[in-house]
């Protein structure tokens, strides 16, 4: 027979187990699949399947990150992680990147789109993602300790903002950025003009 103290301890442990299980399920519910690219070859660009038409970019030695539509929002999933690349026979580089590549995949969207970007951190240290050159709310700017806390290892952070200006931008970390960028953590962020006639592009 359990005494009162043992009963309370068992109840607390059970509640903690249930709440942690529920929390882990809810944190991953609805998370878009994280595409992974292991090939070093230039991949064919993704043609737009919804929304305004545009001429997608070809990323040399890279690829375009796929997205899914969720109630009118384009959802992407970036995974910050260690990456191994054989640069030449017997010469392996140990890099950091996104979704199996260093540098990371190109993100493409259209001016006026609302994007939601899930960033999962599989690095051995904290990170963030700064959307370089984009006009967005301060809380989405990705500067660790200033606009929001750094993303701890093993956690996912959600960035969400409207793309108000077209252009060629980039993304990179702003949490230990000197090390992380030197290790290869960066990628293109292309925002196509809503009106293709506004500024002709190749």
Where are these regions (language model features)?
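Low-complexity, Pro/Ser/Thr- and charge-rich linker/hinge segments at domain boundaries
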Residues: 192-202
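Non-catalytic, glycine-rich low-complexity segments
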Residues: 65-68, 79, 193
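A short, structural micro-pattern
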Residues: 72, 183, 200-202
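N-terminal processing/targeting junctions
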Residues: 14, 24, 60, 102-106
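N-terminal secretory signal peptides and thylakoid transit peptides that target proteins
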Residues: 1-15
């Amino acid at each position: 027979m359990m005494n009162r103290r043992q009963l309370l301890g068992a109840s607390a442990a059970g509640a903690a187990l249930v709440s942690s299980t529920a929390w882990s399920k809810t944190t991953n519910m609805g998370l878009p699949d994280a595409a992974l690219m292991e090939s070093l070859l230039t991949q064919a660009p993704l043609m737009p399947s919804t929304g305004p038409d545009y001429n997608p970019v070809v990323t040399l030695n890279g690829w375009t990150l796929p997205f899914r539509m969720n109630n009118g929002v384009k959802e992407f999933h970036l995974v910050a992680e260690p990456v191994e690349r054989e640069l030449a026979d017997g010469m392996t580089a140990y890099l950091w990147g996104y979704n199996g590549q260093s540098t990371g995949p190109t993100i493409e969207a259209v001016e006026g789109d609302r994007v939601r970007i899930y960033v999962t951190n599989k690095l051995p240290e904290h990170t963030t993602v700064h959307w370089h050159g984009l006009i967005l709310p301060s809380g989405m700017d990705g500067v660790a300790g200033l606009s929001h806390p750094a993303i701890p290892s093993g956690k996912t952070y959600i960035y969400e903002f409207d793309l108000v200006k077209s252009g060629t931008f980039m993304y990179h970390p702003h949490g230990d950025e000197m090390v992380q960028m030197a290790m290869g953590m960066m990628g293109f962020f292309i925002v196509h003009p809503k009106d293709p006639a506004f500024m002709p592009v190749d």
